[in-house]
Curated annotation (Swiss-Prot):
Bias (Low complexity): 1-17
Localization: Cytoplasm; Nucleus
Residue span of region Disordered: 1-20, 136-157
Name used for this protein in its record: Heat shock protein beta-9
Keyword Nucleus tagged: yes
Main localization of the protein described in the UniProt heading: cytoplasm
Presence of keyword Endoplasmic reticulum: no
Matching PANTHER family: HEAT SHOCK PROTEIN BETA-9 (PTHR47896:SF1)
Composition bias type Basic residues, residue spans: 148-157
Cellular component, GO annotation: cytoplasm; cytosol; nucleoplasm; nucleus
Annotated sHSP domain residues: 35-148
């Protein structure tokens, strides 16, 4: 199991059920592993905010999973990547190309960081997905929708 480095005592870390993600109790930082896919997934289409989950797509063509760092930090998703290509032209002159990528965005407050996944498609699409936590039974029954319905059914005198 990988653990995210922390200056907290070892008793302050809790292991996640996801074998490659660990969180510290105080600052909630997690590094997500980037899985390389062998084919483009049909599910990787657009950035999506849904009621039960989250998906973000980023163009990262040319990067390998090892060159990308995907982290969840205090309710934000942060993706960074850096790579360098060096070579020599036929005329003997050298070249160096540096490429960087950086994307940061806020995550839904009820998103479960331990259930997030990250994959890189052959076409260079980095896709990060996550599911929202289930509401406790008491909140699910008395959620905002049920409260609004009960108010709307009252008759005014």
């Amino acid at each position: 199991m990988q653990r995210v480095g922390s200056s907290l005592p070892s008793g302050s870390q809790s292991a996640s059920q996801c074998p490659s993600v660990a969180f510290t109790e105080r600052n909630q930082v997690a590094t997500l592993p980037v899985q390389r896919l062998t084919e483009d997934a049909a599910a990787v289409r657009d950035n999506v905010h849904t009621e039960d989950g989250f998906q973000m797509k980023l163009y990262a063509h040319g990067f390998t999973p090892e060159e990308l760092l995907v982290q969840v930090n205090s309710g934000c998703l942060v993706v960074t990547g850096q790579r360098q290509l060096e070579g020599c032209n036929p005329d003997g002159t050298g070249f160096r190309v540096a490429q960087k990528v950086h994307q940061q965005m806020s995550l839904p407050p009820d998103l479960d960081p331990a259930a997030m996944t990250c994959c890189l498609t052959p076409s260079g699409q980095l896709c990060v997905r996550g599911q929202c936590r289930a509401l406790p039974p008491s909140e699910a029954q008395t959620g905002p929708a049920s409260r609004f319905r009960s108010r709307g059914s009252k008759k005014l005198a």
